[in-house]
């Protein structure tokens, strides 16, 4: 499924960047990692990060937020994720959440509200096309992002073990 988010009117849109992103968690919640691959004109940049106590959904959001923050100027962006939560949240639910003061239809706070706000802000300068792929289905970039996320967890768990 694809979702498109339009940016405000601006001069001719510039560069087209592809972002692939994934999050992982050991336990849910538990230690987590995220990975992203940014591609522009055949060149790739890999990003990853870690959180000590988090959820898989938080890591999915963090991956895209950090990837968008890495862009130095407004771009046309295609974001590919295996997270339906992320794809549906940004394409379908976020508009109502904002209208309702970041509350759900049953008047509770939106889960991961701070991350959704950060993602919304990170999206603003860009024209974004959201793509969904099935996770662990052999999609090369998604598999790479998953490996980056898992490696971030492993790296930090090893560091924590050697500090003890």
Swiss-Prot record:
Describe the reaction catalysed, as an equation.
Endonucleolytic cleavage to 5'-phosphomonoester
Into which EC class is this enzyme placed? hydrolase
Name the predominant localization.
cytoplasm
Q: Needs which cofactor?
A: Mg(2+)
Q: Which residue intervals define the domain RNase H type-1 in the entry?
A: 13-154
Residue sites binding Mg(2+) 1 per the record: 22, 60, 82
Q: Which residues bind Mg(2+) 2?
A: 22, 146
User: Per the annotation, how and in what number is the cofactor bound?
Assistant: Binds 1 Mg(2+) ion per subunit. May bind a second metal ion at a regulatory site, or after substrate binding.
**One GO CC annotation:** cytoplasm
Is Nuclease tagged as a keyword? yes
E.C. code: 3.1.26.4
Q: Which GO terms describe its biological process?
A: DNA replication, removal of RNA primer
GO molecular function annotations of the record: magnesium ion binding; nucleic acid binding; RNA-DNA hybrid ribonuclease activity
Subcellular localization is given as:
Cytoplasm
* Entry-linked SUPFAM superfamilies: Ribonuclease H-like
Task: Cite a single Pfam family from the UniProt record.
Answer: RNase_H
Q: Which residues form a coiled coil?
A: none
NCBIfam families assigned: PRK00203.1
Per UniProt, subunit arrangement is: Monomer.
Functional note: Endonuclease that specifically degrades the RNA of RNA-DNA hybrids.
- UniProt xrefs under HAMAP family: RNase_H
Which family does this protein fall into? Belongs to the RNase H family.
Q: What is this protein called?
A: Ribonuclease H
Which organism is this entry from? Syntrophobacter fumaroxidans (strain DSM 10017 / MPOB)
